[in-house]
Each structure stands twice: as structure tokens, then as C-alpha cells.
């Protein structure tokens, strides 16, 4: 079971609600994924931005925990304001802190992320910061009291997969809070790899919503999470330089 801030979840897959071709596809993909946690941008909620479509309108929100994110924030102050708006709606106290430092790469601003996380923790939020794969930054965020850390596999929406598995493995090994691999996932193979490294969960959006068949891809991602986690728990065999025969050699006559 995945545990975040005292809450437990059966699924280790967190799913974004944006970018789907239509509401029906979104609804079916969410169902196929088996997720317990849906994430969304506070900026896109109709209740806060009149004239915009509510990305959650087609979903039965009683079945899911919600994880609002502060996408679009460039400063700690903006992120804190968006988080407080989400909580004011009565949805939840859990928030994904996202403070972007570069418009081209969409990589997070480490200083502003730290500032926003610290303020929101003081404010009683369950805080999940989106960050780079920098171990020292991840440790600092954990020390602040963050309830989970969300390092990027690669730039948001790039589909490049896990570019630095060594850096991710350092974070996974040294942190005690859940590590949720976020951003850049492109395929079920990427998901399985993240889980085999020991990640506690993965968060996806573009990899499902922009695929050729989002519903099938959501199911594939669900299975990849389960397979990768089982593989991690089972433990892979040691890598060796040379071959090791898998069949017994006893009883075989030699010329």
C-alpha cells in the first residue's frame, strides 16, 4: 500500500486529468488506470477561472482523492496562493507544489520550491513537491517536512523516460518518505523501470492522454506499475560478466 501523509492508497499510479481528446476518453482512461489519486491544475478549475472548462466535470470525484497542483506558478508566493485557493474549495489539504523556473524546459525552481513547501507545511498542507533528480534538494525537502518527493524522470511531457536512473536510485535509497517519479514518462517500460528501481509510485498524464489509445495505455500503465513493483519486491538476479548455465550438466556424457 502507498501511504502519503497518513492516508493509504491501493494503487501506486497517480493520474493527471488534462490533455485528453474528450471527456468520455478521460473518464474511461481514469477507470482503466485503477488510480486512487487524480491530479489537476488549480488554474484550470472553472470555479476559479470563469469561462474555462472544468477538467473534473465528467468524473465521479467521490471515488478518488484529489491532488491539486500549482502548475503555472513562477514564485513561491504564486504557488502558495494557488494551494490556498484549492483548499478553500473544500477539496483537500494535499497539494503538489510545482514552481517552474524555465519556460522552455519546465524544470522546477529549487529555491522557490523550497520556500513554497516550507510555507505550506506551516499552513497544515500535505505537501508533495515536484523537483529535479538532485539528491541534496530532495533531502532538504524531506527535512522541511514534505510528505512525499516527486523527482522528474525527464522534462515534463517530453516522453524521454528515465534519463538518470542513478540519480533517482540515490533519492529512493536515502529518503524515508515516498518517492513518486513524476514527469517525462513515455511508455509502460519507463513505468516498470521506475518501479523496479524502488520508486513508491509514478505520476502520469501526457503518456496516457497523448497516446494513440488513452484507455488501452492507461491499462498498460496500471499493469506496468504492478509488474515493476512485484519485480522490485522479488529482487532481480545479480548481473554477471559471463554466462551461467541454467541447465544441470550432471549426467551428460562427453566424447
Swiss-Prot record:
Active site (catalytic residues): 96 (schiff-base intermediate with dxp)
GO BP annotation list:
thiamine diphosphate biosynthetic process
Q: What is this protein called?
A: Thiazole synthase
Q: Is Cell wall biogenesis/degradation included in the keywords of this UniProt record?
A: no
Primary role: Catalyzes the rearrangement of 1-deoxy-D-xylulose 5-phosphate (DXP) to produce the thiazole phosphate moiety of thiamine. Sulfur is provided by the thiocarboxylate moiety of the carrier protein ThiS. In vitro, sulfur can be provided by H(2)S.
Q: Where is the protein localized?
A: Cytoplasm
Asked whether the UniProt record includes Ribonucleoprotein among its keywords, one would answer no
Residue ranges that the Swiss-Prot or TrEMBL entry lists as coiled coil: none
Identify the species of origin: Exiguobacterium sibiricum (strain DSM 17290 / CCUG 55495 / CIP 109462 / JCM 13490 / 255-15)
Q: Which reaction does it catalyse?
A: [ThiS sulfur-carrier protein]-C-terminal-Gly-aminoethanethioate + 2-iminoacetate + 1-deoxy-D-xylulose 5-phosphate = [ThiS sulfur-carrier protein]-C-terminal Gly-Gly + 2-[(2R,5Z)-2-carboxy-4-methylthiazol-5(2H)-ylidene]ethyl phosphate + 2 H2O + H(+)
What is the uppermost EC class here? transferase
One GO cellular component term of this record is: cytoplasm
Q: Which domain of life is it from?
A: Bacteria
Q: In which pathway does it act?
A: Cofactor biosynthesis; thiamine diphosphate biosynthesis
The UniProt keywords, alphabetically, are: Cytoplasm, Schiff base, Thiamine biosynthesis, Transferase
Sites binding 1-deoxy-D-xylulose 5-phosphate sit at 157, 183-184, 205-206
Q: Which gene encodes it?
A: thiG
Molecular-function annotations in GO:
thiazole synthase activity
For this chain, the family text in UniProt reads: Belongs to the ThiG family.
Q: What is its EC number?
A: 2.8.1.10
The subunit structure is: Homotetramer. Forms heterodimers with either ThiH or ThiS.
Amino acid at each position: 500500500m502507498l501511504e502519503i501523509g497518513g492516508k493509504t492508497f491501493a494503487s501506486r499510479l497517480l493520474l493527471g486529468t488534462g490533455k485528453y481528446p474528450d471527456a468520455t476518453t478521460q473518464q474511461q482512461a481514469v477507470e482503466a488506470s485503477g488510480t486512487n489519486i487524480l491530479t489537476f491544475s488549480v488554474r484550470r478549475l472553472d470555479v476559479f477561472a470563469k469561462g474555462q472548462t472544468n477538467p473534473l466535470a465528467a468524473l465521479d470525484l467521490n471515488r478518488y482523492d484529489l491532488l491539486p497542483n500549482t502548475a503555472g506558478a513562477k514564485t513561491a508566493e504564486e504557488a502558495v496562493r494557488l494551494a490556498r485557493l484549492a483548499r478553500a474549495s473544500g477539496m483537500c489539504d494535499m497539494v503538489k507544489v510545482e514552481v517552474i523556473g524555465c519556460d522552455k524546459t519546465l524544470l522546477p525552481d529549487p529555491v522557490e520550491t523550497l520556500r513554497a513547501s516550507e510555507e505550506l507545511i506551516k499552513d497544515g498542507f500535505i505537501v508533495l513537491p515536484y523537483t529535479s533528480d538532485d539528491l541534496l534538494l530532495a533531502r532538504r525537502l524531506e527535512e522541511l517536512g514534505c510528505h512525499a518527493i516527486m523527482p522528474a524522470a525527464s522534462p515534463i511531457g517530453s516522453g524521454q523516460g528515465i534519463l538518470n536512473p542513478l540519480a533517482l536510485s540515490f533519492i529512493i535509497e536515502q529518503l524515508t518518505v515516498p518517492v513518486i517519479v513524476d514527469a517525462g514518462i513515455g511508455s509502460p517500460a519507463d513505468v516498470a523501470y521506475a518501479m523496479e528501481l524502488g520508486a513508491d509510485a509514478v505520476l502520469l498524464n501526457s503518456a496516457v492522454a497523448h497516446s494513440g489509445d488513452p484507455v488501452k495505455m492507461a491499462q498498460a500503465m496500471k499493469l506496468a506499475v504492478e509488474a515493476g513493483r512485484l519485480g522490485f519486491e522479488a529482487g532481480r538476479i545479480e548481473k554477471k560478466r559471463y554466462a551461467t548455465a541454467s541447465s544441470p550438466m550432471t549426467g551428460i556424457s562427453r566424447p
